[in-house]
């Protein structure tokens, strides 16, 4: 069940859902807007011949912080990591989805590539996967509204929420845009010729 504005406010005011800092003005009819933090991770394309999710690649990204109130310029075709200004904490019976803002999508800004789902039990700043699919650079201002969180009530609390030992949660408590840690639990099924 998708939570309405009144359900979202009740969940936040009771402390079940935490957004820090929380601004009641960000509550929409069925979502909560989130703002862009000031840190970005840019890819160092010259360090590796390719990206390999099976191995650690230190130095694949570099942390960038714009000076003062200066915007970050996202060039056409560029992909960077960023994060929400808000720290988000979900209880064991609420999951969330990050969605982009319509007005920014109409400018060619994609807020996440594929990883918009946030598990129950998660706590941390949500990493954004920003892409510019327009033909012009886009200015990204720290503190601007960058996306929205839709929250869903689970049919029952998760038996093993994010952050539990069973899950091997690699991003619990993350601060700022966190690079991929896929190598920590990379698995691969051997596909043989003639299968199927």
Swiss-Prot record:
> InterPro entries attached here?
dCTP_deaminase, dUTPase-like_sf, dUTPase_trimeric
Q: Annotated pathway, please?
A: Pyrimidine metabolism; dUMP biosynthesis; dUMP from dCTP: step 1/1
Query: SUPFAM superfamilies recorded for this chain?
Result: dUTPase-like
Gene3D superfamilies under this entry?
2.70.40.10
Keywords, alphabetical: Hydrolase, Nucleotide metabolism, Nucleotide-binding
Q: Does the keyword Nucleotide-binding apply?
A: yes
A biological process from GO: dUTP biosynthetic process
Top EC class of this enzyme: hydrolase
Give the EC number(s) listed in the UniProt record: 3.5.4.30
Catalytic residue positions: 129
Q: Does the keyword Nucleotide-binding apply?
A: yes
What top-level branch of life does the organism fall under? Bacteria
Provide a Gene Ontology MF annotation, just one. dCTP deaminase (dUMP-forming) activity
Positions marked as site (Important for bifunctional activity) = 116-117
Which annotated residues bind dCTP? 101-106, 119, 127-129, 148, 162, 174
Catalyses which reaction(s): dCTP + 2 H2O = dUMP + NH4(+) + diphosphate
Role, per record: Bifunctional enzyme that catalyzes both the deamination of dCTP to dUTP and the hydrolysis of dUTP to dUMP without releasing the toxic dUTP intermediate.
Give the record's family classification.
Belongs to the dCTP deaminase family.
Subunit organization: Homotrimer.
Q: What is this protein called?
A: dCTP deaminase, dUMP-forming
Q: Which organism is this entry from?
A: Thermobifida fusca (strain YX)
Q: Species lineage, top-down?
A: Bacteria, Bacillati, Actinomycetota, Actinomycetes, Streptosporangiales
């Amino acid at each position: 069940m998708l939570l309405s504005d009144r359900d979202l406010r009740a969940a936040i005011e009771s402390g079940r859902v935490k957004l820090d800092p929380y601004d009641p003005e960000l509550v929409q009819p069925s979502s909560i807007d989130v703002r862009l933090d000031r840190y970005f991770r840019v890819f160092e394309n010259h360090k590796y011949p390719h990206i390999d999710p099976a191995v650690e690649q230190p130095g694949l990204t570099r942390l960038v912080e714009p000076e003062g109130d200066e915007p970050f310029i996202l060039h056409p075709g560029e992909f960077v990591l960023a994060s929400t200004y808000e720290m988000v904490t979900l209880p064991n019976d609420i999951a969330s989805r990050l969605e982009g803002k319509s007005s920014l999508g109409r400018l060619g800004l994609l807020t996440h590539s594929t990883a918009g789902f946030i598990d129950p039990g998660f706590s941390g700043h949500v990493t954004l996967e920003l892409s510019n699919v327009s033909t012009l650079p886009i200015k990204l201002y720290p503190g601007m509204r960058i996306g929205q969180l839709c929250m869903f009530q689970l049919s029952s609390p998760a038996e093993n929420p994010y952050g539990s030992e069973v899950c091997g949660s690699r991003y619990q408590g993350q601060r700022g845009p966190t690079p991929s840690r896929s190598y920590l639990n990379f698995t691969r099924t051997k596909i043989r010729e003639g299968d199927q």
